[in-house]
């Protein structure tokens, strides 16, 4: 396992004056000139290994030059327990203070990134291993309170071995103290970004370190609650390769983004831009039609084939073309990151939005990797997490529906597929922000509806929406899949049928030959429909949005609304 970089000790190849000018990369073992290393952000120029970075260099690398204004520098820790191990705690503190030039293991202040204001609290691993004592927690809490008072985002840079044992339960209580301050920011809709650097363990991971609305980590950063040595010595368990690394945690659904150090400032700037967005100008056109066109009626089996064309734009394609500053966020914070669901934030005409959608792909390898757009429970958990995100910040929600259905495997059932879908539907139904759902390809049963409980539901011209796949319907009702075309016709799955039924509120027409023929034109039409829909819905307050959505779905199956039923 890699060790922190250190200066060379009596290397015979170097003159004495050079001993403090070079260091050896703990990963690839190459010699690196210290000035070059610092210019490269303490990242090895040969292997890209991210070495530990001093807290002052960290602040300098992230914030606009000259913008940092420190607070809390005069607050110093107290030896409340009179603790002594091999040395008195007071001696350890004094030594750490001399070496670091700071009173504590955290540097707090205000500043800007690309002009956007924020509050930052950065832990200093060089000060007693970044351990959290009473004053450390107090300063982190003060940073959170400052962010709340100013209603500016809080960025927490974490590097810590955990709680400071020399302060006993006073240290332990900082987990609760800092967590409740972060919770207040969540309640107030103030953005919190947590950045995990190497290493981040113990009480920091189990409190503010993993409570960010967005959790970012540097490549290779070791992050966990119990460290590897504790696990091995306590329960004698061998650990898998890559365990507790940033990449491992991203795949496990706990981290949104693994970002190389030289890209971190740009990623933060994008997040801040999205969260500082305002209202959009009125849409110039509606972008969709609300009346069926008899001439547009097509054979249902033809629509079925078109909806499944792997050349059609995917959710990722729409995110890249429609939303400015789109940032994909990963993970459900419970069990994993399902690639069959793409989620993130961006802006639409200057208005911040949250986006969630099924994701298939265009090539065989991606289709397999995305499970053909069939989500596992983790995918629906991720979607629900992003619905919470939308409501927390008052952002409209846009969902793209394109799935043959939820994954039907044993593993999905064991992890509660039905519950995951039900909770997703329930959460979307209760949102007090505008929600617009668009069926862009396949709308397969409950797995589709989980992302389809919008205030406004649109469908693309060549998409379909159905209670079951026509093949499944044919097999169950006729005992053979040979009557799929008949089943498709009788299920009334086409855009025109759905509009007559009132299941959708509008149809977005596709370019000649279908959406797969011109991604840019399709994205432009869909962007117009989304801007118009969100603009209209944004005129309603939260309670009115909730009531409108409830009434929209209440009418289905109500005999008093028989006028919306399809005519034979």
UniProtKB/Swiss-Prot annotation:
CoA carboxyltransferase C-terminal domain: residues covered: 286-536
GO molecular function: acetyl-CoA carboxylase activity; ATP binding; carboxyl- or carbamoyltransferase activity; zinc ion binding
Subcellular location: Cytoplasm
PROSITE patterns associated with the record: COA_CT_CTER, COA_CT_NTER
Region feature Carboxyltransferase, mapped onto this chain: 21-536
Region of interest (Acetyl-coenzyme A carboxylase carboxyl transferase subunit alpha), ranges: 254-559
Zinc finger extent (C4-type): 25-47
Gene Ontology CC terms: acetyl-CoA carboxylase complex
Enzyme class (EC, first level): transferase
Pfam families in alphabetical order: ACCA, Zn_ribbon_ACC
Region (Acetyl-coenzyme A carboxylase carboxyl transferase subunit beta): 1-253
Record key words, sorted: ATP-binding, Cytoplasm, Fatty acid biosynthesis, Fatty acid metabolism, Lipid biosynthesis, Lipid metabolism, Metal-binding, Nucleotide-binding, Transferase, Zinc, Zinc-finger
Function: Component of the acetyl coenzyme A carboxylase (ACC) complex. Biotin carboxylase (BC) catalyzes the carboxylation of biotin on its carrier protein (BCCP) and then the CO(2) group is transferred by the transcarboxylase to acetyl-CoA to form malonyl-CoA.
Subunit structure comment from the entry: Acetyl-CoA carboxylase is a heterotetramer composed of biotin carboxyl carrier protein (AccB), biotin carboxylase (AccC) and two subunits of ACCase subunit beta/alpha.
Record's protein name: Acetyl-coenzyme A carboxylase carboxyl transferase subunits beta/alpha
Organism per entry: Saccharopolyspora erythraea (strain ATCC 11635 / DSM 40517 / JCM 4748 / NBRC 13426 / NCIMB 8594 / NRRL 2338)
Encoding gene, per UniProt annotation: accD
């Amino acid at each position: 396992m890699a060790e922190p970089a250190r200066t060379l000790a009596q290397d015979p190849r170097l003159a004495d004056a050079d001993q403090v000018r070079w260091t050896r990369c703990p990963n690839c073992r190459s010699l690196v000139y210290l000035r070059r290393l610092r210019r490269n952000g303490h990242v090895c120029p040969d292997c890209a290994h991210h070495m530990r970075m001093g807290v002052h260099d960290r602040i300098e690398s992230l914030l606009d030059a000259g913008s940092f204004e420190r607070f809390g520098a005069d607050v110093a820790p107290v030896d409340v327990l009179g603790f002594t191990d091999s040395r008195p705690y007071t001696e350890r503190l004094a030594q750490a203070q001399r070496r670091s030039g700071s009173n504590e293991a955290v540097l707090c202040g205000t500043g800007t990134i690309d002009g956007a204001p924020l509050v930052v609290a950065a832990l200093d691993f060089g000060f007693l291993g970044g351990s959290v004592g009473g004053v450390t927690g107090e300063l982190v809490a003060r940073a959170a309170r400052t962010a709340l008072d100013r209603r500016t985002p809080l960025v927490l840079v974490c590097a810590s071995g955990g709680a400071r044992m020399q302060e006993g339960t006073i240290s332990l209580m900082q987990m609760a103290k800092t967590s409740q301050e972060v919770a207040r920011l969540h309640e107030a809709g103030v953005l919190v970004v947590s950045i995990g650097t190497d290493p981040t363990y113990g009480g920091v991971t189990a409190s503010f370190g993993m409570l960010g609305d967005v959790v970012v980590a540097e490549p290779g950063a070791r992050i966990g609650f119990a460290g590897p040595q504790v696990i091995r010595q306590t329960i004698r368990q061998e650990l898998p390769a890559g365990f507790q690394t940033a990449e491992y945690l991203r795949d496990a659904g706990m981290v949104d983004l693994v970002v190389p150090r030289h890209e971190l400032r740009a990623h933060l700037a994008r997040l801040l831009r999205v969260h500082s967005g305002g209202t959009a100008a009125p849409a110039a056109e509606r972008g969709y039609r609300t009346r069926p066109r008899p001439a547009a009626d097509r054979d249902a089996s033809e629509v079925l084939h078109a909806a499944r064309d792997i050349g059609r734009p995917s959710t990722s394609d729409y995110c890249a073309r429609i939303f400015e500053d789109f940032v994909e966020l990963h993970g459900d914070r419970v069990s994993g990151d399902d690639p069959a669901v793409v989620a993130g934030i961006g802006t639409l005409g200057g208005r911040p939005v949250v986006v969630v959608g099924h994701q298939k792909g265009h090539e065989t390898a991606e289709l397999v990797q995305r499970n053909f757009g069939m989500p596992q429970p983790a995918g629906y958990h991720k979607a629900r997490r992003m619905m919470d995100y939308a409501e927390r910040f008052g952002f409209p929600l846009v969902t793209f529906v394109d799935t043959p259905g939820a994954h039907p495997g044993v593993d999905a059932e064991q992890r509660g597929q039905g519950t995951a879908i039900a909770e997703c539907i329930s959460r979307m139904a209760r949102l007090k922000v505008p929600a617009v759902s668009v069926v862009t390809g396949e709308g397969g049963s409950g797995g589709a509806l989980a992302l389809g409980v919008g205030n406004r539901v649109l469908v693309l011209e060549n998409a379909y929406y159905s209670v079951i796949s026509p093949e499944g319907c044919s097999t169950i009702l006729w005992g053979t899949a040979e009557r799929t075309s008949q089943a498709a016709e009788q299920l009334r799955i086409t855009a025109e049928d759905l509009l007559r039924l009132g299941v959708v509120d509008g149809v977005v027409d596709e370019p000649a030959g279908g959406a797969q023929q011109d991604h840019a034109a399709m994205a432009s039409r869909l962007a117009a429909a989304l801007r118009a829909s969100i603009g209209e819905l944004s005129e309603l307050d939260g309670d009115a949005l909730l009531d409108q959505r409830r009434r929209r779905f209440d009418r289905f199956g109500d005999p008093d609304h028989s006028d919306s039923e399809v005519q034979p």
